[in-house]
Every structure is written in C-alpha cells, then in structure tokens.
C-alpha cells in the first residue's frame, strides 16, 4: 500500500479541496484507495460580496461544477452567496445550480440577493438527494412544478423569501411543505408574512421543530392577518413575531419547548391570542422574551390553561412593572421546578414599603413548588434585598437561589455577597449562589 493511502480521510479531503477538478481526477490513477474519496467533493463554496456583475471567478467556479458533474463527482455541501444578480446572469447561475443538483448534493445553501423577477430552477424542488436546504434572500417563490417532491429533505431554512398564491396553482408555501415527506425542521427568518400571499397556515403532521423570526418591527398601519398552526408532532417552537389578529387553529399537542417574543406594536390592538395560549398547554420548557409577551397572560388570563407538564419557566421582567401576569403563570404551573426572571419588582426610592400591592406580600409563593430560582439582573439595592428576603421566606421548596450581579467593584461585591448570605430562608436546603457579571 502507498504512503498516501495511510493518511486520514479528513486530510485527504483537505488536499483534494485545494486542487482543481482536473488535478483531483488524476489522483485516482495514483492511488486506488483514493478513488472513492476523489469522486466526493466535501464542500463547494462561492462568495461574491461585490455589488457589480458576476465576476469571471464565478464563471470559472461554475465551469468547475460542470466538470464535476461530467466526471460523475458527488458534492456533499454547496454554498453560493451573491451580493447582486441581474437578468442577464440568471441563466449562468441556474445552469450552475442544475449541475450541483445532478451531483447529488446533500446540503444546499443559496444566498442570492435579488429583488427582481428571478426564479429558482424548478429542479430545486424535485431534488431527491438534498437533506438540508437554505434559500434566501429577497426573491419570490411563486409557482412550484407539479411534480415537486423532496423525499430526503429534513431541514428547510427560508431567509427573507416571499411566497405567492395563485388561484390556479394554489399556495406555493403550502405546496412546498407538502412536497417534503420527511421534513423535521422549518426555519423562517425575516418573516413579514403580511407581505406574503399565502394560505396563512403552517400545517404538517411530521414537523418537529419550527422557528419563525421577524426582522422588521415597524408597523405601517396595516392589520396582521391570522395565522394557524396545525403541527401536532411539533416539539420545539421559537416564535418571534408581531401579534396576529387571531390564531384560528393551534394544534401543538407534542410541544416540549417554546420560546415566544410577541411585542405589541400599536395602541388599540384588536389581536386575539387565546388559542395560541391554549395551544401551549403541554409545554415543558417555556421562555417568554419581552415584557409585553408575559403581559398577554394577564390580558387573556381566562384562556390560560393549567400547565401540568411545565417544569422550567423563563420570563422577562422589569423592576417598575407589576407581576400580575407572573402570578397567573405560577398559579397555573403546579409542577414548576425552575424559574428564571430578569429583575425583581419593587417600589422606588422614598416609598415606605418597597413591596408592591400586586405581590400581596409574596404569599402566592407559599404554594409554589419551585426548587431553583435564577435572578439575572440584580443591582444589590436595599429595595432589591428586601424582595429577596420575602422570596426566601415564602419559597418553602427552594434548593438553589442563583443571583447574577452587575458590578465590578471589589468592595461592592463583598458587601452584596455578605448581605445575601445573611438573609433567612424558609427552606433549610436552600443555597445562595452569587455570580458577578
């Protein structure tokens, strides 16, 4: 056996990636054990950050991809990022993509910054090999081929991609999801679905993970149309969006973890999130970003279900905002073990009593089964210390109080640490842990 064949596969792949297609092909005549490795291209990447026309280097890159197809090479991962694209360049790009698809690509990433009438080649939606696909950004997916079918696709990421609804062809978004029989994860970034023409429904019986992230939070005065979520097998849900007018259908029966950030963008809202709140019933880990999001559980408190499975709750809080909504959540979470909050709520300087009426002396904590409490924004003020004392006196099951303190002064750190460790605790098992950040 030759010495080259003894090299690890990772080293061989690295050597091959530095060679031209022609040079790499010649290697199979040098070492028989390189034959299978040479025919596999681990990654092919092209990044053009210029705003001008496609460079000659991309045309050379496209030629190499064509040679790889002619030599029956396979491409594991392909990434194409173009800062701009004009009509005259559409054919060059799409021919390159067709060659990539014929090379049996597994991981396909496209970031083509175009605002015109550009359309992806239809073969994108009939690729039998691709397992992970990322599409972006700015173009429209209007019509899918009738034979659209992505039998191996498990992860689909859409970045600032818009969809259209045709009276004859129907909803292109719905058709795309239906063409993915094993899809497990869907990520929609830059989601301004009021700009979409679609069915306003995310429906899948097999989807496990869904992320919807809005990038623009400016309200232009238009209404935010309803969205339905019919995803009974979903286990992970990350939803950062503006509030919708309503959520007609919400089926999230298998939900394990949910992260929500739903700020209100305008006064006089007509939104209705009752079904969305009810749909979270089976969640085990719930993270609520933005104070507005938690406030929804107070506004629609009659719709809040009993969270039998919830054991970890993380919420955004502010020292000047009442805890009425947090009380609702705690009362509806009989098996909660871990609670993470940002700031403690208290009255400001000059008040005789720093404890707000909404807290009712913290008596509502007596029935809470919380074992771990984390406070991530603590300044060590007298009013804050008083709130911690009340908390420790009322959480009977508490095992760990973790407090993050923002200070860099050594003497201040020592004083805060000493004050916290001196506070009485209702639970003899409770330990106080202070982290300075």
From Swiss-Prot:
The record's listing under PANTHER family reads: RNI-LIKE SUPERFAMILY PROTEIN
SMART domains on file:
FBD (SM00579)
How is this protein named in the record?
A: F-box protein At3g62430
Among SUPFAM superfamilies, the record links this protein to: F-box domain, RNI-like
**Natural source organism:** Arabidopsis thaliana (Mouse-ear cress)
Superkingdom per UniProt: Eukaryota
Q: Name one Pfam family in it.
A: F-box
Enumerate the spans annotated as F-box domain.
1-49
């Amino acid at each position: 056996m030759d010495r080259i064949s003894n090299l690890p596969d990772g080293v061989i792949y690295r050597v091959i990636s530095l060679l031209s297609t022609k040079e790499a092909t010649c290697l199979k005549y040098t070492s028989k054990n390189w034959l299978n490795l040479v025919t596999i291209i681990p990654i092919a990447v092209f990044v053009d950050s210029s705003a001008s026309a496609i460079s000659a280097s991309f045309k050379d890159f496209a030629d190499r991809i064509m040679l790889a197809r002619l030599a029956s090479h396979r491409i594991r991962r392909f990434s194409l990022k173009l800062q701009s694209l004009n009509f005259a360049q559409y054919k060059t790009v799409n021919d390159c993509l067709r060659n990539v698809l014929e090379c049996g690509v597994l991981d396909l990433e496209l970031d083509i910054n175009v605002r015109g009438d550009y359309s992806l080649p239809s073969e994108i939606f009939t690729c039998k090999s691709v397992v992970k696909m990322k599409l972006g950004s700015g173009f429209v997916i209007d019509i899918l081929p009738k034979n659209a079918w992505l039998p191996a696709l498990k992860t689909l990421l859409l970045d600032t991609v818009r969809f259209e609804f045709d009276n004859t062809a129907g909803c292109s978004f719905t058709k795309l999801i239906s063409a993915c029989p094993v899809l497990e994860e869907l990520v929609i970034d830059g989601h301004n679905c009021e700009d979409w023409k679609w069915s306003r429904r995310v429906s899948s019986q097999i989807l496990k993970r869904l992320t919807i992230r809005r990038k623009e939070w400016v309200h232009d005065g238009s209404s935010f149309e309803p969205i339905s979520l019919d995803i009974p097998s979903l286990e992970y849900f990350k939803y950062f969006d503006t509030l919708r007018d309503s959520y007609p259908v919400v089926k999230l029966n298998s939900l394990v973890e949910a992260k929500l950030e739903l700020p209100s963008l305008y006064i006089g809202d007509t939104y209705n999130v009752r079904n969305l709140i009810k749909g979270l019933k089976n969640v085990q880990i719930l993270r609520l970003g933005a104070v507005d999001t938690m406030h929804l559980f107070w506004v629609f408190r009659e719709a809040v279900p009993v969270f039998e499975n919830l054991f970890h709750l993380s919420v955004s809080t502010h020292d000047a905002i009442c805890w009425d909504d947090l009380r609702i959540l705690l009362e509806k979470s009989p098996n909660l073990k871990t609670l993470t909050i940002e700031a403690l709520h208290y009255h400001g300087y000059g008040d005789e009593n720093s404890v707000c009426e909404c807290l009712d002396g913290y008596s509502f904590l007596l029935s809470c089964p919380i074992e771990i409490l984390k406070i991530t924004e603590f300044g060590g003020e007298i009013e804050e210390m008083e709130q911690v004392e009340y908390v420790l006196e009322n959480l009977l099951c508490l095992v760990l109080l973790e407090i993050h303190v923002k200070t860099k002064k050594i003497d201040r750190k020592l004083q805060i640490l000493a004050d916290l460790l001196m506070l009485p605790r209702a639970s003899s098992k409770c330990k106080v842990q202070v982290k300075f950040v």
